[in-house]
UniProtKB/Swiss-Prot annotation:
Family: Belongs to the DCP1 family.
Protein name (record): mRNA-decapping enzyme 1A
Compositional bias ranges of the Polar residues kind: 193-229
Pfam families: DCP1, mRNA_decap_C
Region (Disordered): 152-174, 191-234, 267-291
Gene: Dcp1a
Subunit structure: Forms a complex with EDC3, DCP2, DDX6 and EDC4/HEDLS, within this complex directly interacts with EDC3. Part of a cytoplasmic complex containing proteins involved in mRNA decay, including XRN1 and LSM1. Interacts with DCP1B. Interacts with DCP2. Interacts with DDX17 in an RNA-independent manner. Interacts with PNRC2. Interacts with SMAD4. Interacts with UPF1. Interacts with ZC3HAV1. Interacts with ZFP36L1. Interacts with NBDY. Interacts with DHX34; the interaction is RNA-independent.
Organismal lineage: Eukaryota, Metazoa, Chordata, Craniata, Vertebrata
Length: 602
């Protein structure tokens, strides 16, 4: 009995020592855990530790190992956030510790007493262990942790590709705004394609082709309804893919891709990783620019595309075919700039090689098939004076494009617009340029060109003299008559000049010597200047003034306000060449002097 009692007492002492050591080790672990949490608050527990390790690094240039200044205790810990595992070496030599997260990209190799590993940045390190048992234990733990992280990443990838619940919603997964926008975009495109299938049957092949992506997605996902798994193929949209293209599901038809090629592209895209998966893989493989989404297709692709109800721009090939046809006959002649029958004047020649996105050249090519804006309306029925104007060398449209379809100018305006050399009616022109209407054929109307405004220098003096002589009865005769009636010395003061009443850019009805087109295009300034003049003529005709002298022809003409230089030239010419004018002027001068003398005497 004594022997048995002596053998029991040491056992009790050993168990008490082990429990005491466990309490001490637990307290040390708690202290170590608190110290680690100061550096990383997401650490939850310590998985394993070893007392003495040293870190070596491999130098590829020297092809040898180099010892670092990191040496101390190794801790393997667990974290509550990603990455969920890691290890650190608490350095005893300095304040720089080694912290390495453990993920699926970490590779370990055991070479006793060293544990080699390579991280994601392709740096190679070696951990030397003082105890070989610790080296084997830590190596086995690291292998288990890497395997666990690999399974975790694969599960996260599967959860990202397909919903984790039956109703298509996952509470653990965060809400993705791009995924919500892509689902709304897919639903909108399905509604648009459904409406277009009813309106135009030509879009049915492209609709079937665009639905291949959703069909292959259904084959890879688990069993479920079509509505649950259809949006899963478009979860990895980017902002550029979502807002950068317009109607991308109609791309296969515009680019001329076959259905087999599209199936192959979609099959390759479905086997890739989720990060490289593209919802629209055929956009990059076609090699066509994004400008084809706007309807600017090439001529070769234009023949492959089926009939679509949406409007597209006319290609150069279609314009070349339509240009061979005869131009339609119109009641009014076209402008020479827009007329297809004048190849020398029309700058719309066919260019053999055009850029694909040159919309401006294509727009210019379509202009020969349009009417001139000024000749768009039919000529209204006018009175007898308009019939006479149609026989004159200047035929100008007098009607504007108004909703009522009536002619705005009156008959007097029509008479003012036409120019008849038989009655010697001269319109108001700037005397500084001295431009006169040259002789022209009376067979057809002429079109005013820039060359008609250039007058030879030899005709300038004669034209100026003729105009000043003809204007003397119109302007100076009423002035002299008013001086004789009023006997006012202020008559000789300089008259007010209104530069806006005299056209500076030349008369709008100057003819040219061309016989290509039998119509005259008028600028908008003609209607702005002639309408108030016609109103002044009607007002003057209704109220005759006793101050007007001369013939009946001069009474019908409006008074023209001359500038200082024009008045000076006219007066000098009349004083030198007209003796009656000089006599009348001298008589008025004597009367004014007599009146001033009488007023001074009174």
């Amino acid at each position: 009995m004594a022997l048995s009692c002596s053998t029991v007492r040491p056992r009790r002492r050993g168990s008490a020592l082990r429990s005491k050591m466990e309490l001490l080790s637990r307290a040390e672990q708690e202290m170590s855990l608190a110290a680690l949490k100061q550096h990383d608050p997401y650490i939850t527990s310590i998985a394993d530790l070893t007392g003495q390790v040293a870190l070596y690094t491999f130098c590829p240039k020297a092809n040898q190992w180099e010892k670092t200044d990191i040496e101390g205790t190794l801790f393997v810990y667990r974290r509550s956030a990603s990455p969920y595992h890691g290890f650190t070496i608490v350095n005893r030599l300095n304040m720089h510790n080694l912290v390495e997260p453990v993920n699926k990209d970490l590779e370990f190799q055991l070479h006793e007493p060293f544990l080699l590993y390579r991280n994601a940045s392709l740096s190679i390190y070696s951990i030397w262990f003082y105890d070989k048992n610790d080296c084997h234990r830590i190596a086995k733990l690291m292998a288990d942790v890497v395997e666990e992280e690999t399974r975790r990443s694969q599960q996260a990838a599967r959860d990202k590709q397909s919903p984790s619940q039956a109703n298509g919603c996952s509470d653990q997964r965060p809400i993705d705004i791009l995924e919500m926008l892509s689902r709304a975009k897919d639903e909108y495109e399905r509604n648009q394609m459904g409406g277009s299938n009813i309106s135009s049957p030509g879009l049915q092949p492209s609709t079937q082709l665009s639905n291949l992506g959703s069909t292959e997605t259904l084959e890879e996902t688990p069993s479920g309804s079509q509505d649950k798994s259809a949006p899963s193929g478009h979860k990895h949209l980017t902002v550029e893919e979502l807002f950068g293209t317009s109607l991308p599901k109609e791309q296969p038809t515009a680019m001329g891709l076959e259905s087999e090629d599209t199936d192959k592209l979609l099959g390759d895209a479905s086997q890739k990783e989720p990060s490289s998966f593209l919802p629209f893989p055929f956009e990059q493989s076609g090699g066509a620019p994004q400008s084809e989404n706007l309807g600017i297709h090439s001529a070769a692709h234009h023949t492959v595309q089926p009939e679509v109800s949406t409007p597209v721009l006319i290609t150069p090939a279609s314009i070349a075919q339509s240009g061979d046809k005869h131009p339609p006959s119109y009641t009014l002649p076209l402008s020479p700039v827009l007329s297809p029958t004048l190849p020398a004047e029309a700058p719309t020649t066919q260019v053999p090689h055009l850029p694909r996105n040159s919309t401006m050249i294509q727009a210019v090519k379509t202009t020969p098939r349009q009417k001139s804006p000024l000749l768009n309306q039919p000529v209204p029925e006018l009175s007898h004076s308009s019939l006479v104007a149609s026989q004159s060398p200047f035929r100008a449209p007098v009607s504007l494009a108004n909703p009522a379809g009536t002619a705005l100018p009156s008959v007097d305006l029509l008479q003012k617009l036409r120019l008849t050399p038989q009655h010697d009616q001269i319109q108001a022109q700037p005397l500084g340029k001295g431009t006169m209407a040259p002789s022209f054929s009376s067979a057809a109307g002429q079109l005013a060109t820039p060359e008609s405004f250039i007058e030879p220098s030899s005709k300038t003096a004669a034209a100026r003299a003729a105009v000043s002589a003809s204007l003397s009865n119109m302007v100076l005769a009423p002035t002299l008559q008013s001086m004789q009636q009023n006997q006012d010395p202020e008559v000789f003061s300089q008259p007010k000049v209104l530069p806006s009443a005299i056209p500076i850019a030349g008369s709008p009805l100057v003819p040219a010597t061309t016989t290509a087109v039998s119509s005259v295009l008028l600028s908008p300034s003609v209607f702005q200047q002639t309408v108030p003049r016609a109103a002044d003529l009607e007002r003057k005709a209704s109220s005759p003034s006793p101050l007007t002298v001369g013939t009946a022809e001069s009474q019908r003409k409006p008074s023209i306000i001359l500038s200082k230089s024009q008045l000076q030239d006219t007066l000098i010419h009349l004083i030198k060449n007209d003796s009656s004018f000089l006599s009348t002027l001298h008589a008025v001068y004597l009367q004014v002097l007599t009146k001033n003398k009488d007023n001074h005497n009174l």
